[in-house]
A protein has these predicted regions:
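Cytochrome P450
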Residues: 1-417
Length: 417
């Protein structure tokens, strides 16, 4: 039997400079012309770009596997090309193994667990804004350190080292794989994370506290306690998921609010609108743009002939702008409701940190608007991530504002002497 060719073939590389310059336009074209298409980039993969394809694939774990395999090289299975991270539980597991691990993660990321973190989140947001508030000018991206500090602190690690975790885990998914930054993350920063986190797990095994790491040590998976390797696997994923995504959401939202002063004023006048606005920011900015799966068997999928072992990229960002699902999808309507966006993914792997991410984003946007309501962004000075393929966002957002007063009695972290 002759093999069906993979088609239609498109010119698409989500890690290219061309894509970074206009990822919204690139996905619009794909969605309109061939929502399930093959590209030869990075060894070849399918790109799923319309809402129905992404919806169907993300709910079909039987055909679209998240498990680590030899297809597409070595490393983290859910991105293309794969990145050299440790095995990540539960995101690289399919059912049935997946379920009991996800239950253990849900226990520390549930809405109730996140409500207990309210004061911690507020403290970090206040402390980060304190660091810049008296100056009248700063890089707004600095405030984006909050999610990393909260995540690291929640796991019981030293929050003052939050930047080292960002340099490691966020860089692997936001810097071009051929850059010096990426090589530093892979060869220096990630090994440091592994050494530090493994030492932390060992210390908590000796002496548990009330942090999330101790909760994993006490949790049962299939009627047994987890090994250090399993716990490390979960912690590295939580750090990886926690440090960059919310920062990307908030910084993009703050730049948009600067460009749309009328909408900014509405949120200043009525902060209770922020919750719904955050959902719209999630939809249009889609911090995690696209993640991957591996096809488990030859199959026909929405007109395309998939083969076992093919890699597939599901674009949440593109699905989130599908006009068949959202009226005027390129309009940012901060009152849009309902808003069935897929920014947190869909199906069994839907983001375990969504409640934490939302809580941090609401607190950060709320406090910036309250304490720095007149911030002016130097738009020409904005530096985007050079690669917008997996995570979209900004590295730097110079801004000025009317100075204000610090609120915490002392800085969050000891000052370097
Ligand atoms: C705005 C913030 C966030 C966005 C946009 C986001 C996005 C996503 C997406 C799209 C997925 C689906 C992965 C897949 O289907 O393969 C996911 C999964 C996940 N996220 Fe998030 N995330 C955010 C915040 C967080 C935070 C704060 C944490 C934890 C500290 C976190 C931890 C996780 C974990 C553990 C998974 C894997 C769940 C599983 O495999 O069952 N995320 N996230």
């Amino acid at each position: 039997m002759t093999e069906q060719p993979r088609c239609p073939i498109v010119h698409f590389d989500h890690h290219s400079a061309e894509h970074a310059a206009d990822h919204v336009g690139a996905y619009r074209e794909l969605r309109e012309e061939c929502p399930v298409a093959w590209t030869d980039a990075h060894g070849g993969f399918w790109v799923l770009s319309d809402y129905p394809s992404v919806f169907e694939a993300s709910r079909d774990d039987d055909l679209f596997s998240s498990a680590r395999s030899e297809h597409g090289g070595e490393g983290l299975a859910i991105i293309i090309p794969k990145a050299p991270t440790a095995f990540h539980i539960p995101i690289e597991l399919d059912p049935p193994q997946f379920r009991s691990y996800r239950k253990a993660v849900n226990a520390v990321t549930s809405p109730a667990a996140v409500r207990r973190l309210t004061d911690v989140i507020d403290k970090f947001v206040t402390g980060f804004i304190d660091e810049i508030i008296e100056t009248g000018e700063a890089d707004l991206a600095f405030v984006a350190g909050v999610p990393a500090a909260v995540t690291v602190d929640w796991l019981g690690l030293d929050a003052s080292e939050y930047k080292r975790y960002v340099d490691a885990m966020h860089t692997l998914v936001s810097a071009p794989p051929d850059s010096a930054e990426y090589a530093h993350a892979r060869d220096v920063a990630v090994p440091w994370v592994e050494k530090t986190v493994r030492a932390h797990i060992a210390a908590r095994r000796e002496q548990p506290t009330d942090d999330a790491t101790s909760a994993f040590l006490a949790a049962e998976v299939d009627d047994r306690k987890m090994t250090d390797d399993e716990i490390y696997s979960i912690l590295e994923l939580l750090i990886s998921g926690g440090v960059g995504t919310t920062a990307s959401l908030v910084t993009q939202a703050l730049v948009w609010l600067y460009r749309n002063p009328g909408e900014r004023q509405r949120l200043i006048d009525d902060p209770s609108m922020i919750d719904v606005a955050v959902e719209e920011f999630l939809r249009v900015f889609s911090p995690t743009q696209a993640l991957a799966r591996t096809v488990t068997r030859d199959a026909e999928f929405r007109g395309a002939h998939l083969r076992a072992g093919d890699r597939a990229l599901m674009s949440w960002a593109s699905a989130n702008r599908d006009p068949r699902q959202f009226d005027d999808p390129d309009e940012v309507d901060i009152t849009r409701w309902p808003n069935k966006h897929m920014a947190f993914g869909l199906g069994i792997h839907r983001c375990a940190g969504s409640h934490l991410g939302r809580a941090m984003a609401r607190a950060m946007i709320g406090q910036v608007l309250e304490r720095m309501p007149d911030y002016v962004v130097d738009v020409d000075g904005i530096v985007r991530y050079p690669d917008q393929g997996t995570n979209a966002g900004y590295h730097s957002i110079p801004c000025s504002f009317t100075p204000g007063k610090r609120r915490l009695a002392s800085p969050l972290f000891p000052r370097a002497s």
